[in-house]
Amino acid sequence: MTKSELIEKLATRQSQLSAKEVESAIKEMLEQMATTLESGDRIEIRGFGSFSLHYRAPRTGRNPKTGSSVELEGKYVPHFKPGKELRERVDAVNV
C-alpha cells in the first residue's frame, strides 16, 4: 500500500474528513515520526510495533559494478519491531 492509497482508504472510511485533511494528518504524523527518530528517540505504538535506530558497525563492502572493496562507515538505520497483536494477525494469514 502506498501513502496515496492509505490516504484514499482513510478518507473513504472517515467520511467526515476530506481527503486533504487526511493527507495533512498522515504527512504530519510521518514528519513527527521522522523527527523523533532523527533525535534518537524510540517510537512505540502499542499493539502495532516500535520504531528505533540500530547501529550498523563499519565494514568492508564491495562495489557491485567494479568488484573492488569499499570501506563503509558505521551508521544508524531505522528499525521496526512488530508488536504482539500485529504479529498474531499476520501469522493468522493463510497465503
Swiss-Prot record:
SUPFAM superfamilies: IHF-like DNA-binding proteins. CDD domains: IHF_B. One of its GO terms (cellular component) is chromosome. GO terms for biological process: DNA recombination; regulation of DNA-templated transcription; regulation of translation. Keywords: DNA recombination, DNA-binding, Transcription, Transcription regulation, Translation regulation. GO terms for molecular function: DNA binding; structural constituent of chromatin. This protein is one of the two subunits of integration host factor, a specific DNA-binding protein that functions in genetic recombination as well as in transcriptional and translational control. Heterodimer of an alpha and a beta chain. Belongs to the bacterial histone-like protein family. HAMAP family: IHF_beta. NCBIfam families: hip, PRK00199.1. This is Integration host factor subunit beta. It comes from Shewanella sp. (strain W3-18-1). The lineage of its organism: Bacteria, Pseudomonadati, Pseudomonadota, Gammaproteobacteria, Alteromonadales.
